[in-house]
Amino acid sequence: YPGVYLFPSFTSNSIDGGGMELINQISKSVERMQLFAEETDALSTSLFSDTYNLAYDQDGRISLPESLIVHANLENKAIFVGQGRKFQIWNPDDFDEFKKKAKIKALEHRNLIGPVELSNEKGMDKD
């Protein structure tokens, strides 16, 4: 599918986005919750009812829906922040403040990063 999925972030005034793989991952996470629990209904409704499936135009651009523009406080500029499996779109001023706080949190929780096993695919030795 030549497009992207976007939805308002739950944790900040930014826009979360990604491809079908992200949507599938979110769906699987919700499916692991109790089927008829109130929390499951609230989460799945909040996630999926506000998700936009947007196609790229002939120049590879998308147009953001007004509700996402308002949620992220976007005006003349936006910043795109890659985050591995997903990305975020921010008002640059809001992102600067978030980034400062994120660095502090990252230092506090750096022990959550587990060891990484290096492969020998590109001539890297494990020893």
Q: What does each model-identified segment do?
A:
Residues 1-53, 58, 67-127:
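Flexible "stalk/tail and boundary" regions
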